[in-house]
Amino acid sequence: MNSQVIIFDTTLRDGEQALQASLSVKQKLQIALSLENTGIDIIEVGFPISSPGDFKSVQTISKNIKNSRICSLARCLDKDIDAAAEAMHSSNAFRIHIFLATSILHMESKLKKNFDQIIDMAITSVKRALRYTDDVEFSCEDASRTTMDNLCRIVEKLINAGVKTINIPDTVGYTVPNELSSIIHNLFQRVPNIDKSIISVHCHNDLGMAVGNSISAIQAGARQIEGTINGIGERAGNTALEEVIIAIKVREDVLGVSTKIKHKEIYRTSQIISQICNLPIPPNKAIVGSNAFAHSSGIHQDGVLKNRKNYEIMEPSSIGLKEVKLNLTSRSGRAAVKHYMTEMGYRECDYKIDELYASFLKLADKKGQVFDYDLEALAFINQQQEELEHFSLSFFSVQSISNGLSTASVKLLCGKKTFIESATTSNGPIDAIYQALNRITHFPIILQKYQLIAKGKGKDALGQVDILVEHKKRKFHGMGLATDIIESSAQAMVNVLNNIWKANQVNEKLKKLKKINN
């Protein structure tokens, strides 16, 4: 049996169904190009008959994708199949993906057809699709709830008709791994021409088993896995392809299969799709979550510093993640604190670890997460966070006009002096406030990340803004919380400015100490 698993991505079709608003043609093309760059074998780019916009998206993507095979969805209707072929005609090679329900529940309550009629519809549609391409895939919708006899019967007839890929969907995420494995195993045992087609699975995550089901299907003989990047999709989502891909790589010793995926592109592609679709990745998400390679426990941090393999089963760089740091929290031990100080260029003789660690624990209990610049302040200024609030926002106002420009006025208390900045105009209220604040402090910064998280529901919900900026090649974090998004954004930037000021104070003190020592 072939040891290569084909990766079929349906982020642009099934995944888009999870979004509150449809993606633009430009956004879909950007995602498709990223998927192609990652080495995805088959990209299902849409359902052309569903809307003129989807037709145009499929058409545009088909003209631009050269290395991955393009695929479009179609019902067992002539107009669907014709539209799919027309939308993809400019592609080097394309696949038409036809689907029809085969479970008794769907046949009786949705389609009002008997099984013989279902078979006739399926075969007729396959023959029409074969006029346009020799690459036809057929999905037996709700296959996991279809009787085994019926499933074997229709699969055999579809293969005889010329279908190259038979897809077995767990449409409602009802199946558990040993059940899906049994279905695939039975197909291989009972369908005489099964070797003439690739068996695929398409799992949904309603019971949280999509990835587990996909892996069990591979072990039973399936050689195509369908899913989406980050597992996005209707209801609880689809199989998270990045998890299946890395599981295949890490556990090749057990699974005995491989893919053609460029693993180092996975993290980048995941982030691109998250941003374009406006679907934040949960921190604890396997493979691509921000905590996937993070360590907070002191015991774990010590073990990782001695040998990453103690608590990591793969290298972060294997998915294209360049920078991985230990989280400094109240659970961190001395080893992690020492590691951060060493990373910043300090020797153990430059500070007293016992005093630093005691101060660190106090700050961590108050603040939650501590950053490198916090450690510097504790080590060399010996002051807690609240004692170092040099800047405080005493007043701000924003006026926006219809052309998109906004004017911000701010009053910032800086130590014992009050500076007033007004009439700073920019594109949008938040950027206007940020420019006004920066003109007061004269800190050259680059905003690298802005994240808004809703805390609660309704008009009184709080908006938490987390930002990450770069200042003189160092990263600084800031957080603001308020019912007004603009206010929380301003608070976050003031938080950043205080952190930069604190770091500058440390640098000035260290310079003076060096002069004295010299």
Swiss-Prot record:
InterPro entries: 2-IPM_HCS-like, 2-isopropylmalate_synth_dimer, AIPM/Hcit_synth_CS, Aldolase_TIM, LeuA/HCS_post-cat, LeuA_allosteric_dom_sf, LeuA_bact_synth, PYR_CT. Pathway: Amino-acid biosynthesis; L-leucine biosynthesis; L-leucine from 3-methyl-2-oxobutanoate: step 1/4. CDD domains: DRE_TIM_IPMS. Gene3D superfamilies: 1.10.238.260, 3.30.160.270, Aldolase class I. Residues 392-518 are annotated as: Regulatory domain. The keyword Transferase applies. SUPFAM superfamilies: 2-isopropylmalate synthase LeuA, allosteric (dimerisation) domain, Aldolase. Keywords: Amino-acid biosynthesis, Branched-chain amino acid biosynthesis, Cytoplasm, Leucine biosynthesis, Manganese, Metal-binding, Plasmid, Transferase. One of its GO terms (molecular function) is 2-isopropylmalate synthase activity. It catalyses: 3-methyl-2-oxobutanoate + acetyl-CoA + H2O = (2S)-2-isopropylmalate + CoA + H(+). Residues 5-267 form the Pyruvate carboxyltransferase domain. Signal peptide: none annotated. It comes from the Bacteria. One of its GO terms (biological process) is L-leucine biosynthetic process. GO terms for cellular component: cytosol. Its cofactor is Mn(2+). It is found in: Cytoplasm. SMART domains: LeuA_dimer (SM00917). The keyword Transferase applies. HAMAP family: LeuA_type1. Catalyzes the condensation of the acetyl group of acetyl-CoA with 3-methyl-2-oxobutanoate (2-ketoisovalerate) to form 3-carboxy-3-hydroxy-4-methylpentanoate (2-isopropylmalate). Homodimer. Belongs to the alpha-IPM synthase/homocitrate synthase family. LeuA type 1 subfamily. This is 2-isopropylmalate synthase. It comes from Buchnera aphidicola subsp. Rhopalosiphum padi.
